[in-house]
Amino acid sequence: MVCGSPGGMLLLRAGLLALAALCLLRVPGARAAACEPVRIPLCKSLPWNMTKMPNHLHHSTQANAILAIEQFEGLLGTHCSPDLLFFLCAMYAPICTIDFQHEPIKPCKSVCERARQGCEPILIKYRHSWPENLACEELPVYDRGVCISPEAIVTADGADFPMDSSNGNCRGASSERCKCKPIRATQKTYFRNNYNYVIRAKVKEIKTKCHDVTAVVEVKEILKSSLVNIPRDTVNLYTSSGCLCPPLNVNEEYIIMGYEDEERSRLLLVEGSIAEKWKDRLGKKVKRWDMKLRHLGLSKSDSSNSDSTQSQKSGRNSNPRQARN
């Protein structure tokens, strides 16, 4: 038998991978788990219908994977990245083919990075971070190993991801798919969203690079800032997605309210941000709102300190009989 013979070992060492794979399939105990139909509801719309367990996150069954992937439903609902669902399914329900049955195929590093860039700002906003078990650093690069990306999959109906006209090698969400939910600048919204920065700025340029849109603006006035330094100069507002929401027009002047990425010292223009045409009246309103917000914050702090002091005092005299004695 070729597999067990010295000649077979020599052939294996010589790099005849096809023969080696055949040998492994025939050796008892070396057989890998077979492909199985995708049963994870979130992943049934993806362009592959066969997967294999355990997956890249070491879930032994799809039932376990379903419970784990459900935690991302809320993040998927924000549409923070067109690559997020593809990336998650490539990790939780990896594609399985006859040619690659021994080890699930990993998603490409670039897919992970695009998903993280688009969605990490949303996670940061709610005091979370990108999950460590979904780290991009260890994933293969497209031209150095076997991996999958949306660009590499063409369905019977053609490519699911249209070509980006600004980069022939990049495919992403088309601008026609971007539906921005308008948010008006009101005191209620300002209090609820608690923005990290508010600036008056003129839009100089909108840069589109693959799955990222960046707005280049000239800062005219800083109405509010937090930890990230904002110069009275040209700065970038990072959307970290293929959509510019809220929309901006070049050469127009806006009042912009958004969030920041402290770790990267970036100003973010993401879901929940506001951009309205600049009006002096609106600028004055926002300054008043911010003063109220600061006052409310101080009042709450003073109130809690007062309550704490009062409770300590009342604690010492909690028993009237003891006090009289």
Curated annotation (Swiss-Prot):
Entry comment, domain topic? The FZ domain is involved in binding with Wnt ligands.
What spans are recorded as compositionally biased (Low complexity)? 299-314
NTR domain ranges (all copies): 178-298
Question: Where does the protein principally reside?
Answer: secreted
Disease involvement: Osteoarthritis 1: A degenerative disease of the joints characterized by degradation of the hyaline articular cartilage and remodeling of the subchondral bone with sclerosis. Clinical symptoms include pain and joint stiffness often leading to significant disability and joint replacement.
Domain of life, per UniProt, equals: Eukaryota
Outcome following mutation: residue 324 to G: In OS1; associated with disease susceptibility; has diminished ability to antagonize Wnt signaling, in vitro
- Report, as the record phrases it, the tissue specificity of this protein: Expressed primarily in the cartilaginous cores of the long bone during embryonic and fetal development and in the appendicular skeleton (6-13 weeks). At 13 weeks of gestation, transcripts were present in early chondroblasts of the tarsal bones of the foot, the carpal bones of the hands and the epiphysis of long bones. Highly expressed in placenta and heart, followed by brain, skeletal muscle, kidney and pancreas. Weakly expressed in lung and liver.
Renumbered to this chain, the signal peptide range is 1-32
Q: Which UniProt keywords apply?
A: Developmental protein, Differentiation, Disease variant, Disulfide bond, Glycoprotein, Secreted, Signal, Wnt signaling pathway
What is its subcellular localisation?
Secreted
- Residue numbers spanned by region Disordered: 297-325
- In the UniProt record, what gene is named as encoding this protein? FRZB
Q: Report if keyword 4Fe-4S is assigned.
A: no
* One biological process term in Gene Ontology: skeletal system development
A GO MF label: Wnt-protein binding
**Organism ancestry:** Eukaryota, Metazoa, Chordata, Craniata, Vertebrata
Would I find Signal among this entry's keywords?
yes
Gene3D superfamilies given in the database record: 2.40.50.120, Frizzled cysteine-rich domain
Q: Which GO terms describe its cellular component?
A: cytoplasm; extracellular space; membrane
Q: Which residues are glycosylated?
A: 49
Known partners and oligomeric status = Interacts with MYOC.
Membrane-spanning ranges: none
Protein name as catalogued: Secreted frizzled-related protein 3
Which pairs are disulfide-linked? 35-96, 43-89, 80-119, 108-147, 112-136
Question: Where are stretches of biased composition, namely Polar residues?
Answer: 315-325
Functional description taken from the UniProt entry: Soluble frizzled-related proteins (sFRPS) function as modulators of Wnt signaling through direct interaction with Wnts. They have a role in regulating cell growth and differentiation in specific cell types. SFRP3/FRZB appears to be involved in limb skeletogenesis. Antagonist of Wnt8 signaling. Regulates chondrocyte maturation and long bone development.
